[in-house]
Amino acid sequence: MTGSDQTRAKLIDIELDESIGRSTPDVEHERAVAIFDLIEENSFQPVNDSGAGPYRLKLSLAEQRLVFAVAREDGTAVVTHILSLTPLRRIVKDYYMICESYYDAIRSSTPSHIEAIDMGRRGLHNEGSQTLMDRLSGKIDIDFDTARRLFTLVCVLHWRG
């Protein structure tokens, strides 16, 4: 990919389905950080897109499925991919539980206990990110860092929904 292609194969806007509502302050903070980081640095290219990015992404849940609605910068629809949440459900549930433990530990535990929980949290996050990359394979090309940030947003949607 040339330098010009790399600047175009990216997301410039991410929207989460707001109809699901708000969550806890900790979850909302994770959402805001993930969106900021994702827009700052990402690699995102719908497979077989004859046009060019940059892209806008709307993430939502519909009938227990994850919806990736991709549009061009001007809002023109590119593609919508609907993925089953089943392969991610256990990871998201476990990740949510370990995040609750992590947030509780931050407030009251020793640094070594917090670090141990955080290592487990990162491991689950990596597993979820890889699963998301695998599910998007052949549909949307993303790198691992982009998958990590998208997985955070999938978790936020799931926690709200």
Curated annotation (Swiss-Prot):
One Pfam family here: UPF0262
Record's InterPro entries?
UCP032146
Give the family this protein belongs to, as stated in its UniProt record.
Belongs to the UPF0262 family.
HAMAP family noted in UniProt: UPF0262
Protein name from the UniProt record: UPF0262 protein mll6455
Q: What organism, scientifically named, is this protein from?
A: Mesorhizobium japonicum (strain LMG 29417 / CECT 9101 / MAFF 303099)
